[in-house]
Every structure is written in C-alpha cells, then in structure tokens.
Amino acid sequence: MTFIDPSKLDLDDNVVAINRITKVVKGGRRLRFAALVIVGDHKGHVGFGTGKAQEVPEAIRKASEAAKKNLITVPMVGTTIPHEALGVYGGGRIMLKPAVEGSGVAAGGAVRAVMELAGVDDVTSKRLGSNTPVNVVRATFEGLKSLKTAEQVAALRGVSAEHLAE
C-alpha cells in the first residue's frame, strides 16, 4: 500500500456519523462525542477516519485529520468499478457491483458517501449484516481495497491484458 500525500489533492469531506458517548464516573456522567468522516477528491482517492473529543467540532477535526492519513486509491473503469467485490469487516458485509454508465450510485447512507467522494458515479451496492456506520464504512473500504484492474490481474497471472479472457 503506497502512501498518498493529502496536501497534493483537493479533498472534500463528509461527516457520516456523530455519536454521543457517555462514561459514568463517580461524580456523574462524562460526555464526549465521536465523529466518522469520509474524505475524497472525486478522482479515485478516498479515506475515512474517526475522532473523539469533548466538543463536536474538535471530534470532526480529529476525524478529518485521521481520514487524510488513511487514503486509498480506487481502481475505476470509466465511471464504475472493474468487477464485483465483497467487503467484510466485523459483522458488516458490503456487496459492490459495477453498473452501466448513467445508472448512478445505488447505495444508501455511508456507502453512498464513500462512493461519491471516491468519484465512482455508477455502482450498485447491498449492505448485509451490521448497519453500524463505522462497520459499513470499514467493510466498504475492504471491498474497495480488493478491487483490481485488468492489468493488475494480467500481471499476477503472467499474461498480457489482451489474453486475459482466453
């Protein structure tokens, strides 16, 4: 996995979830906030991060910084993904399927945010199992990491990309 320098990219961010967390201590309850943020450049780079703090803006800032350190490159064929993928993280499973151009992003919630910020315009997805935003995002990223272009598959098999289908 190669490091992607976030300072060279024009990144947009999207807050997917903010959770209120309470810790019960002797004097009462201690309140904190956890944020889940997705960042992407709409050109094949996307990342996610989580942050916790006493105030919401600080949690979002921390999550955004963490997301910029966690960028991945999404291989694309035109406006969609190269092949089907299944991402699994914990109890969450995400099935990603390529779609024809013009069909749009058929995904809900956190998966839609990841796909739009990655620049994938046409994809179909199905969320199976856990629907917790953090598990869904992590499973989506596992699915995106498993994607390979035809050239990468050809190199792994030791044949040229033209002879891959034979």
Swiss-Prot record:
- By its UniProt entry, which Pfam families does this protein fall under? Ribosomal_S5 (PF00333), Ribosomal_S5_C (PF03719)
Record bears the keyword RNA-binding: yes
Q: Name one GO molecular function term.
A: rRNA binding
GO CC, sorted alphabetically, is: small ribosomal subunit
UniProt record, GO biological process: translation
Which superkingdom, per the lineage?
Answer: Bacteria
* Keyword vocabulary terms for this entry: Ribonucleoprotein, Ribosomal protein, RNA-binding, rRNA-binding
Residues annotated as domain S5 DRBM: 11-74
| Keyword Aminoacyl-tRNA synthetase on entry | no
Q: Which cysteines are joined by disulfide bonds?
A: none
Member of which family? Belongs to the universal ribosomal protein uS5 family.
What does the UniProt record say this protein does? Answer: With S4 and S12 plays an important role in translational accuracy.
Its domain description in UniProt is: The N-terminal domain interacts with the head of the 30S subunit; the C-terminal domain interacts with the body and contacts protein S4. The interaction surface between S4 and S5 is involved in control of translational fidelity.
- Quaternary structure and interacting proteins, as annotated: Part of the 30S ribosomal subunit. Contacts proteins S4 and S8.
* Protein name per Swiss-Prot or TrEMBL: Small ribosomal subunit protein uS5
- What is the protein's species of origin? Lactiplantibacillus plantarum (strain ATCC BAA-793 / NCIMB 8826 / WCFS1) (Lactobacillus plantarum)
